[in-house]
Design a protein with these regions (language model features):
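Structural signature of eukaryotic scaffold interfaces centered on beta-propeller domains
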Residues: 2-4
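CN hydrolase (nitrilase-like) catalytic-core segments centered on the catalytic cysteine
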Residues: 9, 18-106
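C-terminal beta-strand edge segments of enzyme domains
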Residues: 67-152
Length: 152
């Protein structure tokens, strides 16, 4: 889903959507500058790294809200800015809460800096390799990825 406030365009993807890079890519292509992820499932480290990667590869800010407690927690926010103007890699973590802390958390994104970054850097929609997508569009599922009940 995509929503615009007039000053900012938000994309929204649910917790299961975050498992697939295509969800964030489609929201970016539709104009999202910030992707919000309401979530209610475990936020193990690979999932947190994936959200950071979604921010980086799509040049969008990403924020996930998750309840605390067993099999949950780790609300987080990531900026797409992974390089400073001198080419030095910077940590794009804006907010990362542990799995036990309960509360309301705020993540502040510098949208002016993000927009400027999007205008000069090479990711997002700048150099996508759409000619490679034909292989991704095949519905054929091969071993070892065949599962019972799978959509084919």
């Amino acid at each position: 889903a995509l929503r615009s406030s007039g000053r900012l365009t938000f994309g929204i993807m649910i917790c299961y959507d975050r498992e697939f890079p295509e969800s964030a890519r489609i929201l970016m292509l539709k104009g999202a500058e910030v992707i919000l992820v309401p979530n209610d499932c475990g936020s193990m480290q690979p999932r947190l790294r994936a959200l950071s990667t979604r921010a980086y590869e799509n040049m969008v800010a990403v924020a996930m809200a998750n309840p605390n407690g067993d099999n949950a927690g780790c609300s987080c926010a990531y900026s797409p800015i992974c390089w400073d103007r001198n080419g030095k890699c910077v940590d794009n973590t804006v907010l990362l809460v542990d799995d036990k802390t309960e509360g309301i958390f705020y993540a502040e994104f510098d949208m002016e800096a993000i927009r400027e970054y999007r205008n000069r850097e090479m990711l997002g929609n700048t150099f996508r390799k759409v000619e490679a997508y034909s292989q991704l569009l095949s519905k054929e599922i091969k071993k070892p990825f065949i599962r019972d009940g799978q959509n084919r």
